[in-house]
């Protein structure tokens, strides 16, 4: 199982989303939509072995975590507007500590960024923090029977405190490129690496 989590520092936390202004008034929701596209959509299929989390810390009610489960997703199209509509529906529900399903395979809760990561660590997943200054990809060995969580930052990053937290729990800091990449591009590169193990 491949799982991805992004800390979305400015992404809105209610359903008041302007579909005509995803990058601006919605707190870079366009970035999240592209990440969902990259996490799940193939040319004529969907990735069923993937889960994607977005932990939104924007106004008015942070945090709200969205969870997308590839094996359960239905009716979502790959374009940003379609994905944004499904995100809007999820954010219209009052989030609590428990996961609430808004549409097939899409859930919301009030879980924190660190809580999700600790939960995955306790499940035995290898935790990778994707960072420009990490160890080169070539220095790591991946096995097909392992479960992974890949931690991503948005255009702002995850912040010093969360970086220290990842270091404390033993997350492996990995660099996919000598150049700074968009989060959605990182997801595609990770998929490509793991696809080749099969």
Curated annotation (Swiss-Prot):
It comes from the Archaea. It is an enzyme of class 2 (transferase). One of its GO terms (cellular component) is cytoplasm. It catalyses: pseudouridine(54) in tRNA + S-adenosyl-L-methionine = N(1)-methylpseudouridine(54) in tRNA + S-adenosyl-L-homocysteine + H(+). Its EC number is 2.1.1.257. It is found in: Cytoplasm. S-adenosyl-L-methionine binds at residues 130, 153, 176-181, 186. NCBIfam families: PRK02135.1 (NF002560). This is tRNA (pseudouridine(54)-N(1))-methyltransferase. It comes from Methanococcus maripaludis (strain C7 / ATCC BAA-1331). The gene is trmY.
């Amino acid at each position: 199982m491949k799982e991805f989590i992004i800390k979305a520092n400015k992404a809105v936390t209610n359903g008041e989303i302007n579909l005509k202004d995803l990058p601006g008034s919605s707190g870079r929701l366009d970035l999240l939509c592209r990440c969902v596209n990259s996490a799940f959509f193939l040319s004529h299929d969907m990735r069923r072995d993937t889960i994607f989390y977005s932990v939104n810390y924007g106004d008015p009610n942070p945090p709200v975590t969205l969870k997308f489960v590839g094996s359960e997703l239905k009716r979502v199209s790959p374009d940003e507007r379609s994905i944004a509509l499904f995100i809007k529906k999820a954010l219209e529900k009052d989030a609590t500590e428990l996961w609430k399903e808004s549409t097939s395979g899409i859930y919301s809760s009030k879980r924190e960024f660190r809580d999700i990561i600790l939960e995955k660590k306790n499940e035995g997943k290898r935790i990778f923090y994707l960072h420009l200054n990490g160890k080169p990809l070539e220095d790591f060995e991946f096995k097909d029977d392992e479960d992974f969580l890949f931690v991503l930052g948005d255009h702002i990053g995850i912040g010093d405190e969360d970086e220290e937290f990842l270091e404390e729990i033993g997350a492996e800091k990995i660099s996919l490129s000598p150049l700074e990449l968009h989060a959605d591009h990182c997801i595609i590169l990770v998929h490509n690496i793991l696809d080749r193990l099969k």
